[in-house]
Design a protein with these regions (language model features):
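Histidine-centered active-site microenvironments of extracellular/periplasmic hydrolases
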Residues: 143-151, 248-249, 333-423, 430-435
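Active-site-proximal N-terminal segment of extracellular/periplasmic enzymes that hydrolyze or transfer
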Residues: 24-63, 126, 137, 259-261, ...
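Short, structured active-site-proximal loop/turn typified by the sulfatase FGly-forming signature C/S-X-P-X-R
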Residues: 48-80, 84-88, 128-132, 150-159, ...
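Short, solvent-exposed loop/turn and secondary-structure capping segments
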Residues: 41-47, 70, 77-80, 90-95, ...
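C-terminal cap/loop subdomain of S1 sulfatases and analogous C-terminal strand-loop tails that border
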Residues: 154, 158-166, 172-179, 386-415, ...
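Formylglycine-dependent
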Residues: 93-126, 138-255, 264, 294-319, ...
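Gram-negative bacterial Sec-dependent N-terminal signal peptides
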Residues: 1-22
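Long, internal low-complexity/basic segments
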Residues: 24-28, 35, 39-40, 64, ...
Length: 581
């Protein structure tokens, strides 16, 4: 009789376990892919001349957002995307490569993802998901703050903001005693290797000579494949390092593009992209292109030799873009091969606008410029190779945005309006009132919405303000699922204010409107301006005098945010580019 009772217990346990496993396996998989420093108009779905058919296919099968906002810099965006919280609440009120001196040591300005941020990976792992990361982390270098500490059961890649795409050498001088000693002696620091980490441990880079995005694609596929038969859903995070500096790619990726960019130049490419975006409905047909800013020169002011050098830079960058698209296609093909594509949400976004800092030019620190010139061969013939190191620079960055205002590091639209494509699971789009495949929307949305969306997809609750006995930052994004299902007309209500600040430059988004203040040190006038960014995405028509009540209301809301977040005032003359280390 006792044996019979035990067998009933074991049978019941087995049945419960099987039911739980079945419930897990029915949950959708989630893949988030991040293109690094990809400009708003750098891909085919958003008006680029570059050939990105795999991103085009995702847009045709899913939803393309044309009014989606990230932060102006890499790690800051990633902190909000993975936690759904305000960046100042989780340690990323600053950018680790350019910290304002007055903010050093202040809460919220740690420069890494603090324990006040609970990542979606942590919560999904606890709920039964397999969680994987392959690529760059850029949210912490110390024990306790690495990917394996923040919810990723398997991870591979670098901790820094970028590295050499062929050999993982550091892109800037190391922040260590050797560099400090060299500088004290008046010497130029050497080039060190960016450590490669697997599951929190430094490992040998077995892929030297292989291209970064290809390496990270192969690794994420290996991770998924290793547990594809365990019945559990997976969350795969693929933060690529392309098309971040240094601009490097196999010659076959860009050799057929050089003549095009030399012949057309940045002014023509910028205008052509702006026009294509109008034709595609990415921006309004009556929108005005942004004025040339003070950092940009006319293409025809360059000598023929200079045009060949600058033209090749953009050719390499767009070769990198097309290679990344191929890696997206490889991931899609793999998911189809294992029968998981239809049950997988795929999200592709950029972390910020294109890189305007020119590491061989004037708008960068003396240390970076001198170090780059000393160690790398940046002749026209050598651009794109492993022993070259260049960045896009302000003029090509302006073309990369398609004519929006400013670029990376700026809170203007060129710095924060980024491409965002979501290919939902098949079951969602099959719902009666759901958005149709190929939908393009100019509804306002933001990077914090991704975390909220991921948790709702996985049917996981956020803990709120307390997790495992410690205070944590609440989510302030909203889930996109009700919008996808046709249950709501807008992602955010017209009254929902979305404030943000970095480097002393603030914004507040609200419905169709945006206030923005850019410091004089970054080329602005340190005054607040008001724009309707749905109609005027290049921020050319200031409405503060036409709509004074709304303007003052939004400024007051931003000031409340500034006070609540204990935002450190930044000297008006300070410039992050000149302080990059």
């Amino acid at each position: 009789m006792q044996t019979f009772k035990k067998s009933l217990v074991f049978t019941a346990m087995a049945a419960a376990s099987s039911a739980a496993l079945a419930a897990e396996s029915e949950k959708p998989n989630i893949v988030v892919i991040v293109g690094d420093d990809v400009g708003f108009a750098d891909t085919q779905p958003y008006g680029s001349e570059a050939n990105t058919p795999n991103l085009m296919a995702l847009a045709e099968e899913g939803v393309k957002f044309t009014n989606f906002h990230a932060s102006p810099t890499s790690s800051v965006t990633r902190s909000m995307m993975l936690t759904g919280a305000n960046s100042h609440e989780v340690g990323l009120g600053t950018f680790d490569y350019a910290v304002y001196p007055g903010a050093i040591g202040k809460p919220g300005y740690e420069g890494y993802l603090t324990k006040k941020g609970v990542t979606v990976a942590t919560l999904l792992k606890e709920s039964g998901y397999n969680t994987y990361l392959s690529g760059k982390w850029h949210l912490g270098h110390d024990d306790g703050f690495l990917p394996d500490d923040r919810g990723f059961e398997e991870s591979y890649g670098i901790l820094a903001g970028g590295s050499n795409h062929f050999n993982r050498d550091m892109m800037f001088p190391a922040k260590n005693a050797a560099t400090a000693d060299a500088l004290q002696k008046g010497d130029i620091p050497g080039v060190e290797v960016e450590p490669t980490y697997r599951n929190g441990e430094v490992v040998e880079d077995k892929y030297k000579g292989e291209y970064s995005d290809q390496v990270y694609t192969n690794e994420i596929i290996k991770m998924i494949d290793s547990k594809k038969d365990d019945g559990k859903p997976f969350f795969a995070y693929v933060p690529f390092t392309g098309i971040h500096l240094p601009l490097q790619a196999p010659e076959s990726a860009y050799q057929d593009k050089v003549d095009y960019y030399v012949e057309h130049g940045w002014d023509s490419v910028r205008e052509d992209r702006f026009q294509r975006m109008k034709e595609m409905g990415v921006i309004p047909k009556d929108a005005d292109i942004s004025d040339r800013n003070a950092l940009s020169r006319p293409w025809d002011s360059l000598s023929e030799k200079e045009q060949k050098w600058y033209g090749k830079k953009m050719a390499v960058a767009m070769g990198m873009m097309e290679m990344q698209d191929q890696q997206v296609g490889q991931i899609v093909d793999y998911l189809k091969e294992i029968g998981e594509y239809d049950n997988t949400y795929i999200m592709y976004l950029a972390d910020n606008g294109p890189e305007a800092a020119d590491i061989t030019g004037e708008n960068i620190s003396d240390l970076i410029r001198t170090w780059t010139a000393h160690h790398f061969d940046n002749s026209t013939e050598n651009l794109g190779k492993a022993n070259s190191s260049v960045s896009l620079g302000p003029e090509w960055a302006s073309a990369s945005t398609g004519g929006l205002s400013w670029y990376k590091a700026y809170t203007a639209e060129g710095g924060i309006r980024v491409l965002f494509i979501v290919k939902p699971a098949k079951a969602l789009l099959a719902a009666e009132d759901a958005l149709q495949p190929g939908t393009q929307t100019d509804d306002l949305s933001q990077v914090k919405d991704i975390a909220a969306t991921i948790l709702e997809i996985a049917e996981v609750d956020h803990p709120g303000t307390e997790y495992q006995g410690r205070e944590v930052a609440p989510m302030s994004g909203v889930s996109l699922l009700p919008y996808f299902k046709g249950e709501t007309a807008d992602v955010h209500s017209a009254n929902n204010a979305i404030p943000f600040e970095l480097f002393g430059s603030g914004i507040l988004l609200k419905g169709d409107y945006k206030i923005i203040r850019i410091s004089t040190g970054m080329g602005g006038d340190s005054e607040w301006h008001l724009y309707n960014t749905k109609k005027d995405p290049a921020e050319q028509h200031d409405l503060r005098n036409e709509m004074p009540d709304l303007f003052l209301e939004m400024v007051a809301e931003y000031q409340e945010y500034e006070k609540a977040q204990n935002i450190v005032p930044v000297d008006e003359a300070w410039n992050p580019f000149e302080n990059v280390k």
